[in-house]
UniProtKB/Swiss-Prot annotation:
Cytoplasmic side: 1-7
Keyword Methyltransferase: no
Glycosylation sites: 50, 74, 119, 204, 219
Keywords noted in UniProt: Disulfide bond, Glycoprotein, Glycosyltransferase, Golgi apparatus, Membrane, Secreted, Signal-anchor, Transferase, Transmembrane, Transmembrane helix
Function as written in the Swiss-Prot or TrEMBL entry: Catalyzes the transfer of a sialic acid from a CMP-linked sialic acid donor onto a terminal alpha-2,3-, alpha-2,6-, or alpha-2,8-linked sialic acid of an N-linked glycan protein acceptor through alpha-2,8-linkages. Therefore, participates in polysialic acid synthesis on various sialylated N-acetyllactosaminyl oligosaccharides, including NCAM1 N-glycans, FETUB N-glycans and AHSG. It is noteworthy that alpha-2,3-linked sialic acid is apparently a better acceptor than alpha-2,6-linked sialic acid.
Coiled-coil ranges (or none): none
GO-annotated cellular components: extracellular region; Golgi membrane
GO MF annotation terms: alpha-N-acetylneuraminate alpha-2,8-sialyltransferase activity
GO term, biological process aspect, one: ganglioside biosynthetic process
Binding site for CMP-N-acetyl-beta-neuraminate: 147, 170, 279-281, 301
UniProt topology in membrane: Single-pass type II membrane protein
Protein name per Swiss-Prot or TrEMBL: CMP-N-acetylneuraminate-poly-alpha-2,8-sialyltransferase
Organism of origin: Mus musculus (Mouse)
Enzyme class: transferase
Length: 359
């Protein structure tokens, strides 16, 4: 009899704890959404910041249910966010260094490893743009396309391609996934590690031909290569530069300024979003606020399952695994997503995580 009462007591306490945690999550979400105030600043409470990852980890993706139906752009908020970001960086300028920034033979320190240096090669210098590739460019609608497997079976391809300007990340493949991700690419990032992971480190002619073919599809698009972040990828950058020059590819290369990543991080930290290093997706959204009137995000989903409990791949195009909540990760993607979700609900951007309506 005593053991039965003990089990009932434990069960009752467990139910009360679940009820309390559910109420806590609801209150936290409600509080966060009321914190987007003056000057476009995203002011998150200290308690939310400190508990954010814990809450997200326990509740999973279920706390991020938002609707795209009835979504409306909040133009005044968009303008205030742009104005606030301009206090930290000017994307038109910081999106790339230009030829006049360096001369061949100059030695610079890596952005995230100041003890190590890089020599500006002749090939690299020859590919630096004369002026910013985003100078005086403005667009009504932009799509920033992440690489989450949430895009698979979304049917978002046509909607993505309908935007005036499409930004993609890490040279992700598009042709074989066109129905879900589209093919239009106006600005595409490429971490040096992509050379090894997706193109075999250019070990043979077939790998090099595959890479050249991929870049030839970009035509006059901007290829954004973060060449100055950390030591280790410099040989890949040089190989890429050499192939572009040898094959006379028409892609427009860009290499982010030495201050960009710290300026972007500074903006979010000042607005009480304690990121480590901004992910490529968050970085692209931050830059896009400078030249896009309306920003739509696709392929952003830093969780292993969707809202229905179905497994979601880290990348839509490969089987790479990622531990979203690992302290060893340089990013805090769930926290970034939580922030973007708040901005969606306030009309600053549109975040699509489900199926797209047929056009």
């Amino acid at each position: 009899m005593r053991s039965i009462r003990k089990r009932w007591t434990i069960c009752t306490i467990s139910l009360l704890l679940i009820f309390y945690k559910t109420k806590e999550i609801a209150r936290t979400e409600e509080h966060q959404e009321t914190q987007l105030i003056g000057d476009g600043e995203l002011c998150l409470s200290r308690s939310l910041v400190n508990s954010s990852d814990k809450i997200i980890r326990k509740a999973g993706s279920t706390i991020f249910q938002h609707s795209v139906q009835g979504w409306k752009i909040n133009s005044s908020l968009v303008l205030e966010i742009r104005k606030n970001i301009l206090r930290f960086l000017d994307a038109e300028r910081d999106v790339s260094v230009v030829k006049s920034s360096f001369k061949p033979g100059d030695v610079i320190h890596y952005v995230l490893d100041r003890r190590r240096t890089l020599n500006i090669s002749h090939n690299l210098h020859s590919l630096l743009p004369e002026v910013s590739p985003m100078k005086n460019r403005r667009f009504k609608t932009c799509a920033v396309v992440g690489n989450s497997g949430i895009l698979l079976d979304s049917g978002c391809g046509k909607e993505i391609d309908s935007h005036n300007f499409v930004i993609r990340c890490n040279l992700a493949p598009v042709v074989e996934f066109a129905a879900d991700v589209g093919t239009k690419s106006d600005f595409i990032t490429m971490n040096p590690s992509v050379v090894q992971r997706a193109f075999g480190g250019f070990r043979n002619e077939s790998d090099r031909e595959k890479f050249v073919h991929r870049l030839s599809m970009l035509n006059d698009s901007v290829l954004w290569i973060p060449a100055f972040m950390v030591k280790g990828g410099e040989k890949h950058v040089e190989w890429v530069n050499a192939l572009i020059l040898k094959n006379k590819l028409q892609v427009r290369t860009a290499y982010p300024s030495l201050r960009l990543i710290h300026a972007v991080r500074g903006y979010w930290l000042t607005n009480k979003v304690p990121i480590k290093r901004p992910s490529t997706g968050l970085l692209m959204y931050t830059l896009a606020t400078r030249f896009c009137d309306e920003i739509h995000l696709y392929g952003f989903w830093p969780f292993p399952k969707d809202l229905n409990g179905k497994a979601v791949k880290y990348h839509y195009y490969d089987d790479l695994k990622y531990r979203y909540f690992s302290n060893a990760s340089p990013h805090r993607m769930p926290l970034e997503f939580k922030t973007l979700n708040v901005l969606h609900n306030r009309g600053a951007l549109k975040l699509t995580t489900g199926k797209c309506m047929k056009q």
